[in-house]
Swiss-Prot record:
Changing residue 221 to K: In HOMG7; increased positive regulation of TORC1 signaling; increased phosphorylation of the downstream molecule S6K1. This is Ras-related GTP-binding protein D. It is found in: Cytoplasm; Nucleus; Lysosome membrane. It holds the Pfam family Gtr1_RagA. Changing residue 97 to P: In HOMG7; increased positive regulation of TORC1 signaling; increased phosphorylation of the downstream molecule S6K1. The gene is RRAGD. InterPro entries: Gtr1_RagA (IPR006762), P-loop_NTPase (IPR027417), RagC/D (IPR039400).
Length: 400
């Protein structure tokens, strides 16, 4: 396997003006024998504030993800491996969580949400515990079950948690991670998932709650299954997901690409992919490619004094596999990357792919520019509402 990393050369001004005038994707039938188009981005003059997704959002518009489960089920290990790049072997030394740990996943990545890690022994249904406040602002509830332990108690706790949460907020996505499956055989994995699925849904049916939908995932921190499961959880919280999938479908159909992922490079969560099925091996190759690009860029991409960033708007990578497949990575935004699977014969039309990528990249920026405007508008409305509450009838409230 050969690896090529590099940054494209700046584009001539005349070429940039021509691309500025044409913003439609070019189909394979329209491809000519002219020179390859450059990788340079004509939109480099766009305001950085629009593209910088590290701006922390208010809690009113940021989804909340709850991590729940019994003690030693692996909740904290999942959080550390996915969002803190901790080695799975190091999680063996993590202490049990004895209080609710809240973390913002927003200042280092495009993916914006809060994670609340609940200790297994806490009774959050205690009368002194405001569980309604917690569930009211929740987008997804992840319940972690240790597949290598007796899970009858976990299923009882799952049923209690889901029924209480559903009464408060019917819009919560309920996700069940059947965790630590790395120690099980393939047959045992399937049997365990079937048994947990059957028992959990039977309990809901007996309680007359057939409307509640539970999603089940087989996960382990020792492979990429936990990243794929978290990707699917986060995707449900992204309102722009149908638009992103549609853009990816248009891009690959016009560029001769077999598969494309839109990755968050910090967490290796893919926030969108095209409509073709996701193969686990394909996803693992994408994750490995991102690691290679970031690691090599950290070594060779920084200045002698350590200044600069290992990943920027000119970042690109090409990895040719020994099965005539090419992996192609391109920067989309500050924390987003597009990873494509292309056949070698299709990659000969690199100019077409790069031009269509420019159109795709511009569309992504426009989608999230609208998103930023909506968020800012909500912030302004919240401030106005607070001011109205603070000054009833035009008289400032005096705090005693």
């Amino acid at each position: 396997m050969s690896q090529v990393l590099g940054k494209p050369q700046p584009q001539d001004e005349d070429d940039a003006e021509e691309e500025e005038e044409e913003d439609e994707l070019v189909g394979l039938a329209d491809y000519g024998d002219g020179p390859d188009s450059s990788d340079a981005d004509p939109d480099s003059g766009t305001e950085e504030g629009v593209l910088d997704f590290s701006d922390p959002f208010s809690t009113e518009v940021k989804p909340r993800i709850l991590l729940m489960g019994l003690r030693r089920s692996g909740k904290s290990s999942i959080q550390k491996v996915v969002f803190h790049k901790m080695s799975p072997n190091e999680t063996l030394f993590l202490e049990s969580t004895n209080k609710i740990c809240r973390e913002d996943v927003s200042n280092s990545s495009f993916v914006n949400f809060q994670i609340w890690d609940f200790p297994g022994q806490i009774d959050f249904f205690d009368p002194t515990f405001d569980y309604e406040m917690i569930f009211r602002g929740t987008g997804a509830l992840i319940f972690v079950i240790d597949s290598q332990d007796d899970y009858m108690e976990a299923l009882a706790r799952l049923h209690l948690t889901v029924t209480r949460a559903y009464k408060v907020n019917t819009d919560i996505n309920f996700e069940v991670f059947i965790h630590k499956v790395d120690g099980l055989s393939d047959d045992h994995k399937i049997e365990t998932q079937r048994d947990i699925h059957q028992r959990a849904n039977d309990d809901l049916a007996d309680a007359g709650l057939e409307k509640i939908h539970l999603s089940f995932y087989l996960t382990s921190i020792y492979d990429h299954s936990i990243f794929e499961a978290f990707s699917k959880v986060v995707q449900k919280l992204i309102p722009q997901l149908p638009t992103l999938e549609n853009l990816l479908n248009i891009f690959i159909s016009n560029s001769g690409i077999e598969k494309a992922f839109l990755f968050d490079v910090v967490s290796k969560i893919y926030i969108a992919t095209d409509s073709t099925p996701v193969d686990m091996q394909t996803y693992e190759l994408c994750c490995d490619m991102i690691d290679v690009v970031i690691d090599i860029s950290c070594i060779y991409g920084l200045k002698e004094d350590g200044a600069g960033t290992p990943y920027d708007k000119e970042s690109t990578a090409i990895i040719k596999l020994n099965n005539t497949t090419v992996l192609y990575l391109k920067e989309v935004t500050k924390f987003l990357a597009l990873v494509c699977f292309v056949r070698e014969e299709s990659f000969e039309r690199k100019g077409l792919i790069d031009y269509n990528f420019h159109c795709f990249r511009k569309a992504i920026h426009e989608v999230f520019e609208v998103r930023m405007k909506v968020v800012k508008s909500r912030k302004v409305q919240n401030r106005l509402q607070k001011k109205k509450r603070a000054t009833p009838n035009g008289t400032p409230r005096v705090l005693l």
